[in-house]
Amino acid sequence: MGTAKLVKTKASDLLYTRNDVADSDKKATIELLNRQVVNFIDLSLITKQAHWNMRGANFIGVHEMLDGFRTALTGHMDTIAERAVQLGGVALGTTQVINSKTPLKSYPLDIHSVQDHLKELADRYAIVANDVRKAISEAQDEDTADIFTAASRDLDKFLWFIESNIE
């Protein structure tokens, strides 16, 4: 097989793959996947911003907890982005795309207390958790729905941990 089949064609805007998911389902699912790529990249950066800049009671416990969250978010992000490519799409993860498409409001740079960070994080984790849960039923194939389900389980757990630390 030559490389001609591996480049984008105008006819479908999808990269060639032997995956038999219908092209229309692939396109809808790739859009959904890229929405979550944006969510997970932004949430992972916000998590690290809080991790670096918090001070006060329970610092070390929350600081270390957020490191674990960031690791898991990065794992889900990679799985989600790679699924978009597996379906013949392009994973959209540049800072320009994230900045223009994130549903998350800008994270405040002038807060320092653990409690203030936890409240800000809870709001943002809830947005992403709720959107991923919605994406499960919107996915056009079961494999993508499974990926979203795994991510949803972690996000719900992380939101619970964050909320449990808010005084």
From Swiss-Prot:
CDD domains, sorted: DPS
GO cellular component: cytoplasm
Family matches, as Gene3D superfamilies: 1.20.1260.10
Entry keyword annotation includes Metal-binding: yes
Compartment(s) of residence: Cytoplasm
Keywords: Cytoplasm, DNA condensation, DNA-binding, Iron, Iron storage, Metal-binding, Oxidoreductase
InterPro entries with a match to the protein in the record: DPS_DNA-bd, DPS_DNA-bd_CS, Dps_gammaproteobac, Ferritin-like, Ferritin-like_SF, Ferritin_DPS_dom
Record bears the keyword Cell cycle: no
Domain of life of the organism encoding this protein: Bacteria
The reaction(s) this protein catalyses: 2 Fe(2+) + H2O2 + 2 H(+) = 2 Fe(3+) + 2 H2O
Enzyme Commission code: 1.16.-.-
GO BP annotations listed: chromosome condensation; intracellular iron ion homeostasis
Class in the EC hierarchy, top level: oxidoreductase
Residues the entry annotates as binding Fe cation: H51, D78, E82
Record-linked Pfam families: Ferritin
An example Gene Ontology molecular-function term: oxidoreductase activity, acting on metal ions
NCBIfam families recorded: PRK09448.1
Function: During stationary phase, binds the chromosome non-specifically, forming a highly ordered and stable dps-DNA co-crystal within which chromosomal DNA is condensed and protected from diverse damages. It protects DNA from oxidative damage by sequestering intracellular Fe(2+) ion and storing it in the form of Fe(3+) oxyhydroxide mineral, which can be released after reduction. One hydrogen peroxide oxidizes two Fe(2+) ions, which prevents hydroxyl radical production by the Fenton reaction.
Complex and partners: Homododecamer. The 12 subunits form a hollow sphere into which the mineral iron core of up to 500 Fe(3+) can be deposited.
Family per similarity comment: Belongs to the Dps family.
Name of the protein: DNA protection during starvation protein
Gene name in the database record: dps
